[in-house]
Curated annotation (Swiss-Prot):
Keywords: ATP-binding, Carbohydrate metabolism, Glycogen biosynthesis, Glycogen metabolism, Nucleotide-binding, Nucleotidyltransferase, Transferase. It comes from the Bacteria. GO terms for molecular function: ATP binding; glucose-1-phosphate adenylyltransferase activity. Pathway: Glycan biosynthesis; glycogen biosynthesis. Signal peptide: none annotated. The lineage of its organism: Bacteria, Pseudomonadati, Pseudomonadota, Gammaproteobacteria, Vibrionales. This is Glucose-1-phosphate adenylyltransferase 2. Belongs to the bacterial/plant glucose-1-phosphate adenylyltransferase family. PANTHER family: GLUCOSE-1-PHOSPHATE ADENYLYLTRANSFERASE (PTHR43523:SF2), GLUCOSE-1-PHOSPHATE ADENYLYLTRANSFERASE-RELATED (PTHR43523). CDD domains: ADP_Glucose_PP (cd02508), LbH_G1P_AT_C (cd04651). Pfam families: Hexapep_GlmU, NTP_transferase. Homotetramer. Alpha-D-glucose 1-phosphate binds at Y97, G162, E177, K178, S195. GO terms for biological process: glycogen biosynthetic process.
Length: 407
């Protein structure tokens, strides 16, 4: 796909995912015991044959840059392949990106330099698997100028998305960004057709649309709010069904925006279902990431004779469970679990130590936290709220490197 450029938007603040995003960009947030969120979009590019990639970063990007350098420096420049991380260049004035379209407009020089005919615009903060090659093939076959990936969502949730209407040929006839009263799908009044934020543009159309949008002072410079509605009138904008079953990836129709603590928690817990709604085990679509070379996880007996137990959990390398019990949880690399500790319905990031007799229920523990013996988290909301963030649905989040009081 030498005529196609992938651009991944990875610069959002991710404030709704705080405190997990207090010191890192949302695409760099750990997920599923060993991955980062951006790994899913990058893996899709890799397996789809997209080997020319720009990653546009902005806020708190150090952790993301480090991960991309360590884990994704796999492309061969001699074959025209690259993954280039692009922080704001301030080429269009001394200001940060003001919207999704503005991010690309500020980097128009890189788009032009690529000599690409098509541009695949992606978000770096969604969890899903998709063969972009199949979408590009349909884009070309329909002679489209813009193709938007879409999926059906319950109408009561559709206000969080761009919503579209299509004709019998999948041509988009109407597009509204985050409408208060979302239009429904004909013959299915309880569902709407939502944009996934995945776009394929013809390069010439994209450059013209970005230039025109940049000249409008009152524009918010956003694809969904400003650019796409204007292009609909051309009659050559089409929808691509995410659940069409096309392409090499297994048809699981799983796509999640993990922009809040609750949605992030739910997506992790989805991996623990007896038959997970997203299949991470498809051999020819393995999710790539970077991970340090830790030894295998193990369980050992404690000094009191308790055996370390894992039940229906995901356990990363380097974990040692010395007489604790882990149930329906995700344990990331290099975690230490001590005697009689109980961990249930929880997510632990790297380098956490759980002290003897601790009880962790329905919580997320960020990196580099040492939990003192007999600490209880997730059992008393009143006490937890004094120290930690609690989500709308009661998930307790302990921030990175949190220091417990020794009093």
């Amino acid at each position: 796909m030498q005529d196609t450029l992938a651009v991944i938007l990875a610069g959002g603040m991710g404030s709704r995912l705080s405190p997990l995003t207090d010191d890192r960009a949302k695409p760099a947030v750990p997920f599923g015991g060993k991955y980062r969120i951006i790994d899913f979009t990058l893996t899709n590019c890799l397996h789809s044959g997209l080997r020319r990639i720009l990653v546009l970063t902005q806020y708190k990007s150090h952790s993301l840059h480090k991960h991309l350098r360590n884990g994704w420096s796999i492309f061969n420049p001699e074959l025209g392949e690259f993954i280039t991380v692009v922080p704001p260049q301030m080429r269009k004035g001394g200001k940060w990106y003001e919207g999704t379209a503005d991010a690309l407009f500020h980097n128009m020089w890189l788009l032009a330099r690529s000599d690409a005919k098509y541009v695949v615009v992606l978000s770096g903060d969604h969890i899903y698997r998709m063969d972009y090659a199949a979408m590009l093939e349909e884009h070309i076959s329909k002679n489209a100028t813009l193709t938007i990936a879409c999926m059906q969502v319950p109408r009561h949730e559709a206000s969080a998305f761009g919503v579209m209407a299509i004709d019998d040929d999948s041509r988009i006839t109407c597009f509204v960004e985050k409408p208060a009263d979302p239009p429904c799908i004909p013959n299915r009044p309880d569902h709407s057709l939502a944009s996934m934020g995945i776009y394929i543009f013809n390069m010439d159309v994209l450059k013209k649309a970005l230039t025109e949008d940049a000249e409008i002072e009152q524009s918010s410079h956003d694809f969904g709010k400003d650019v796409i509605p204007k292009l609909i009138a051309t009659g050559s904008v089409f929808a691509y069904s995410f659940c069409s079953g096309k392409g090499r990836v297994a048809r699981d129709c799983y796509w999640r925006d993990v922009g809040t603590i609750d949605s992030f928690y739910d997506a992790n817990m989805d991996l623990l279902q007896p038959v997970p709604p997203m299949n991470l085990y498809q051999k020819n679509w393995a999710i790539r990431t970077y991970e340090q070379q830790y030894p295998p996880a193990r369980t050992v007996s404690s000094a009191t004779g308790n055996e370390g137990i894992f039940i229906n959990s995901i356990i990363a390398n380097g974990v040692i469970n010395s007489g604790g019990s882990v149930q329906h949880s995700i344990i990331s690399s290099n975690v230490r679990i001590n005697d009689s500790a109980l961990i249930v319905d929880s997510i632990l990031f790297d380098d956490v130590e759980v002290g003897e007799g601790c009880k962790l229920i329905h919580c997320i523990i960020d990196k580099h936290v040492k939990i003192p013996p007999y600490t209880e988290i997730g059992l008393n909301p009143i006490e937890d709220r004094k120290r930690f963030h609690i989500s709308e649905r009661g998930v307790v989040v302990v921030p990175e490197s949190y220091q417990f009081s020794t009093e």
